[in-house]
């Protein structure tokens, strides 16, 4: 799932690097149909398990990717879902998959310049996307989310986090720099939400669960290498294998973390 500030330059960076058409399809191979975020459908079901919505509910998915989250929410609850992603190529793919469903909308836009009415959404949801935003723009986004939520609304997020920066080694620093991520601790993330006036802030370090998901995905990749190579190159396989090996290593040594955050407007 993707979003990032500075629409023109960073949109180009993402579409030409991590989220090329082929890159998106490679991610979907390992995450599962309609997903390019950790755990695919299984994690989505778990994370949404205590959320109550209905057919009249309105949901915003920030960094909606291929749309798996919106599709699941619409299927489970019948809710209206609006996905925003900065990458036009990904949004085009997502829209092709929901053609004819007028309760699911995918839009290519920069969430930091997009505006919605106040008190508009019952749920604002984001999966592994806000890592692309600078600290300043994380704050800006959460202020907008607070405004957009209905008084009874809920904010629900998973995102990449990290240990304190003084503990980062050169390898991890290079990874974060190359991806243009801004990673903070789980505790710092929760503090930002509190500072943006959210109430009942719940933060959890789900890194152990994330590591389990990574192990399953890594195993799936190797068990299905022959099928993968019918679709993609050996170079892509090596790159994906290396990426998952690194994330598994960094999660086990508590360098990279996976945060869960839930908060309410009132």
Curated annotation (Swiss-Prot):
It is a peripheral membrane protein. Changing residue 86 to A/F: Reduces activity. It is found in: Golgi apparatus membrane; Cytoplasm. Disruption phenotype: Lack of phosphoethanolamine N-methyltransferase activity and disruption of phosphocholine synthesis from phosphoethanolamine. Growth and morphological defects in trophozoites and schizonts. Lower levels of parasitemia in the intraerythrocytic culture. Reduced number of nuclei in the majority of schizonts. Reduced viability of intraerythrocytic parasites. Reduced gametocyte production. Defects in gametocyte maturation resulting in the absence of stage-IV and -V gametocytes. Lack of oocyst development in mosquitoes. GO terms for biological process: methylation; phosphatidylcholine biosynthetic process. The active site is at residues 19, 132. Induction: Transcription is down-regulated by choline. Proteasomal degradation is promoted by choline. Changing residue 181 to A/F: Reduces activity. Its EC number is 2.1.1.103. It is an enzyme of class 2 (transferase). Inhibited by phosphocholine. Inhibited by hexadecylphosphocholine (miltefosine). Inhibited by S-adenosyl-l-homocysteine. Weakly inhibited in vitro by amodiaquine, chloroquine and primaquine. Inhibited by NSC-158011. Monomer. This is Phosphoethanolamine N-methyltransferase. The lineage of its organism: Eukaryota, Sar, Alveolata, Apicomplexa, Aconoidasida. The gene is PMT.
